[in-house]
From Swiss-Prot:
Protein's name in the database: Apolipoprotein N-acyltransferase
Gene Ontology BP annotations: lipoprotein biosynthetic process
Compartments reported by the entry: Cell inner membrane
Record PROSITE patterns: CN_HYDROLASE
Keyword Nuclease: no
Entry similarity comment: Belongs to the CN hydrolase family. Apolipoprotein N-acyltransferase subfamily.
Pathways involved: Protein modification; lipoprotein biosynthesis (N-acyl transfer)
UniProt domain CN hydrolase: residue ranges: 244-482
One cellular component (GO) term of this entry: plasma membrane
Protein's gene: lnt
Lineage: Bacteria, Bacillati, Cyanobacteriota, Cyanophyceae, Synechococcales
Function recorded in the entry: Catalyzes the phospholipid dependent N-acylation of the N-terminal cysteine of apolipoprotein, the last step in lipoprotein maturation.
Keywords tagged on the record: Acyltransferase, Cell inner membrane, Cell membrane, Membrane, Transferase, Transmembrane, Transmembrane helix
Length: 519
């Protein structure tokens, strides 16, 4: 399953990558589970979750080890290796826990519905319904935690744009639901084919496969129809945005060499973009990694703003009480702060330490600041000269509900600002894939500026109109458009999850009400 994710992008693997997990569930007989078997039950589920979860989350998220070496932060080489390994194991384990809880939920369904007179084939349909609903429910729950990146849905991004259009209807949960259900029916068909238990073998063997194919055709065909809807943007809503990809390595980012290189690169890029007609310029997360007051007092970049009088979205740090924030600032053409967005979803261990009273002395922080960063408030939108903007800073791209809350507050376009220099090219490709999904779900234009790549312009159908190279200094100017309407997912959020769970609950009660008293 991990092979389906960007940048490798073997997206078709996702449509059968969950089959082994489904087959294991169908083969495991939990209908007569008792307490004496509980230990073996938990062990078998744990091992299965580790095997499948490790193959998906462990492979897809292996890029996290790219933080090593951290010697540029003064961390010894071996300690840096230990930190990288711990981060990878932690995020993989969190995914494994999701799979384990799902396996428990499936077992609970089997045990509680074992004594029923419901037709066995229909019972299997209901079981797949529950599997789909519970998986989507768990992914949604996990997406509200502090640690999230990898829904099953993102295996289809950025290449499968027709299928991804369903995100505008039901968000990532609907995409995951299609994939999980298809895997479930394919698994049933494969089991039935191998067992060959029925009298009318050919008919029985193929109807599960047929259902899986019909679901796949429906979501692909329906997505194609959604993709054909014209954008209908008007010239009055156009904003000419300039993007600067600074390409400042982390190894020098926070010393005098990095400061001088950043000032020179961003100032030169800013001036060139204004000459090309950019009405506002977007910079990456932490483009100038200091407080705004320092930027004003000590940088030629600020003087360039005063000279050209073209506003800028600047990645810098802000203050909040006695702490600091990772912020994107709107600076108008007179050099005044017009607005500020403070990053809400901070990176665990990198920007703050969860349960710092317990673990603060055990784990070295990856942040260069002397203090932990503080989260911003929610919801926020960023005031700009062109209307309110929805913003995601780096890690926040993985949290669709965070962006949706900003659209509900009036966000008319999306700004994505990231560093990405900490990690490998794999992370940059997956980050871009997530932003493609966010643009579709929000029905908004998205401008994306990163330090080392991949920077991009993405339209509301998820089409990438421009994509930068990796690890190169680049500037680019392109139009985006303001949009104000709210589509189904933006307005109603995870209604698909709620609907699936309600229907599953009704199906469960139906089976409980009709126990197996005659057969």
């Amino acid at each position: 399953m991990g092979l389906a994710t960007a940048p490798l992008g073997w997206t078709y693997v996702a449509w059968f990558g969950q089959i082994p997990l489904w087959i294991w569930i169908f083969r495991a007989n939990t209908t007569r589970l008792n307490f004496t078997q509980l230990k073996q039950f938990l062990i078998s589920r744990s091992l299965t979750a580790i095997a499948w979860g490790g193959g998906f989350y462990g492979v897809a998220l292996f890029w996290i080890t790219g933080v090593h070496p951290l010697t540029w932060l003064g961390v010894p080489w071996l300690a840096s290796l230990a930190i990288a390994a711990f981060c990878w194991l932690a995020i993989t384990a969190w995914g494994v826990v999701l799979v384990f809880v799902w396996l428990l939920a499936m077992a609970v369904w089997e045990v509680t519905t074992a004594r029923t007179k419901v037709n066995s084939t229909f019972k299997k349909y209901l079981f797949i319904l529950w599997g789909t609903a519970s998986w989507c429910g768990l992914e949604t729950l996990w997406s509200h935690s502090i640690l999230w990146w990898s829904p099953v849905a993102y295996t289809q991004s950025p290449s499968q744009l027709h299928f991804l259009q369903w995100g505008a209807i039901g968000g990532p949960a609907l995409l995951s639901a299609f994939i999980v259900a298809v895997n479930g029916f394919l698994a049933l068909g494969l089991i039935d084919f191998l067992d060959g238990k029925t009298v009318n073998k050919n008919k029985q063997n193929w109807h599960y496969f047929l259902i899986a194919i019909l679901i796949w055709l429906f979501c692909q065909g329906g997505g194609w129809l959604l993709y054909q809807k014209p954008l209908a943007d008007t010239p009055e809503e156009k904003i000419n945005v300039g993007i600067i990809q600074g390409n400042i390595p982390n190894q020098i980012k926070f010393n005098s060499e990095g400061w001088q290189r950043a000032i020179a690169g961003y100032t030169e890029g800013y001036k060139k973009l204004t000459e090309q007609g950019a009405e506002i310029v977007l910079t990456p997360e932490g483009a100038l990694p200091y407080l705004w007051e320092t930027v004003v007092a000590k940088s030629g970049f600020y003087q360039a703003i005063l000279q050209t009088q073209v506003p800028v979205w600047l990645g810098a740090y802000g203050t909040k009480g006695d702490g600091y924030t990772n912020s994107l600032l709107t600076v108008d053409g007179q050099g005044k702060l017009l607005g500020r967005y403070d990053k809400f979803k901070l990176v665990p261990l990198g920007e703050y330490i969860p349960l710092s009273n317990v673990f603060g002395q055990l784990i070295q922080r990856l942040s260069p600041l002397k203090e932990q960063l503080l989260p911003g408030d929610r919801p926020q939108v960023l005031p700009t000269p062109f209307g309110p903007a929805a913003v995601v800073i780096c890690y926040e791209s993985a949290f669709p509900d965070l962006l949706r809350s900003q659209l509900l507050q009036g966000g008319e376009f999306i700004l994505s600002s990231a560093n990405n220099a900490h990690y490998s090219d794999t992370m940059a490709a997956q980050h871009h894939a997530l932003d493609v999904m966010r643009a579709i779900e929000g029905d908004r234009w998205l401008a994306r500026a990163t330090n080392t790549g991949l920077s991009a312009i993405i339209n509301p159908r998820g089409k990438t109109l421009w994509l930068s190279a990796m690890n190169q200094y680049e500037i680019h100017a392109a139009p985006i458009y303001r949009r104000r309407g709210l589509i189904l997912y933006s307005r109603w959020g995870d209604w698909v999850v709620f609907l699936l769970l309600v229907v599953s609950a009704i199906a469960w009660l139906y089976q409980i009400v009709f126990p197996l008293n005659q057969r």
